[in-house]
Structure formats: structure tokens, C-alpha cells
């Protein structure tokens, strides 16, 4: 009975596979929005203000960071919790493939969240006259919470490995 239960629990990890595959659709949706933003800005490129252009570029950078985060979680999560990816060495194999454990994935996700939060905060500062000071204060507090959390996770990871 114990053996059957353990085998069933181990096999249950495959329930994560469609979830990780679903992240590929999320990446596709993000790519569509990215190019929608590009096609939206191109006709206005010569008449748009510098500040609006910078805000648009920050949005594009934000989407690129989220896309990288999706790929990292999708591939590393699959490899860590479902099965190893069998990618031929001759193909464009990602350097970190097979080397990122759940701890390093957690740190990379935290760093990505801090970077994404930084871009959102920068966008807020670009339009600071239009934003309520209390709302801006909460954005800063939330961002600092992300920064402190990422730092704490990195520190905890460092002291537990030594």
C-alpha cells in the first residue's frame, strides 16, 4: 500500500506539465501585446514627446523582463519538478539549462520581480505630477519590500549553503 501511494505521489508531478506548458501560451499573449505596442507607437514616433516615448520603452522593457521570467519559470520549473529536458547539445542549449535548482530559481525570480518593480516605479516617477503622493508612497514601500525580501532570500541562501 505504501509503495502504491508513493508511486502515485511521484507520478502526480506530471500534473505540473500542462501548467508549465500553459506558460508558453502566456508568453505568446505577452508577445502579441509587445508587438501591438510597437505597432501602436510606430506611426506616432516623430510626433510623440520624449517622456511618452520613454514611458513606452519602459513598458516594452517591462514586458521583456516578464517574458524572460516566464521562460525561466517554465523551463526551470519543468526541469526541477517534472522531468529533465532532453535537448541536443548541437541545438542552441541555454547555458543554465539543468543547472538551476529551485533555490537559484527562487533568487532569479526575486531579482526579476525587483527589476520589474523598479521599472513600474520609474514609470510612476516619470508621471509624478499626475500621481497621488500617498499612492506613490505605497509603490515605494512595496518596491522596498521586494528589494528587502530578495536580499533576505539571497542572504539566507548564502548562509545555508556554507
UniProtKB/Swiss-Prot annotation:
UniProt cross-references to InterPro entries, sorted A to Z: UPF0114, UPF0114_bac
GO cellular component: plasma membrane
Major localisation: membrane
Keyword Ribonucleoprotein in record: no
One Pfam family hit: UPF0114
Transmembrane segments: 15-35, 53-73, 136-156
Topology class, membrane: Multi-pass membrane protein
Keyword set includes Amino-acid biosynthesis: no
Annotated compartments: Cell membrane
Swiss-Prot/TrEMBL keywords: Cell membrane, Membrane, Transmembrane, Transmembrane helix
Sequence similarity: Belongs to the UPF0114 family.
UniProt cross-references to NCBIfam families, sorted A to Z: HI0507 (TIGR00645)
Protein name: UPF0114 protein PST_0950
Species of the source: Stutzerimonas stutzeri (strain A1501)
Amino acid at each position: 500500500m505504501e509503495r502504491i501511494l508513493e508511486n502515485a505521489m511521484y507520478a502526480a508531478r506530471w500534473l505540473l506539465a500542462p501548467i508549465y506548458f500553459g506558460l508558453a501560451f502566456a508568453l505568446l499573449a505577452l508577445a502579441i501585446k509587445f508587438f501591438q505596442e510597437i505597432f501602436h507607437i510606430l506611426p506616432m514616433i516623430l510626433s510623440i514627446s520624449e517622456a511618452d516615448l520613454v514611458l513606452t520603452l519602459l513598458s516594452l522593457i517591462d514586458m521583456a523582463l516578464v517574458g524572460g521570467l516566464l521562460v525561466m519559470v517554465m523551463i526551470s520549473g519543468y526541469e526541477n519538478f517534472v522531468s529533465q529536458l532532453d535537448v541536443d547539445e548541437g541545438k542552441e542549449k541555454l547555458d543554465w539549462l539543468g543547472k538551476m535548482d529551485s533555490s537559484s530559481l527562487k533568487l532569479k525570480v526575486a531579482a526579476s520581480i525587483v527589476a520589474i518593480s523598479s521599472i513600474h516605479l520609474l514609470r510612476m516617477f516619470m508621471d509624478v505630477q499626475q500621481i497621488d503622493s500617498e499612492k506613490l508612497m505605497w509603490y515605494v514601500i512595496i518596491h522596498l519590500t521586494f528589494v528587502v525580501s530578495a536580499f533576505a532570500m539571497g542572504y539566507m541562501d548564502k548562509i545555508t549553503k556554507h
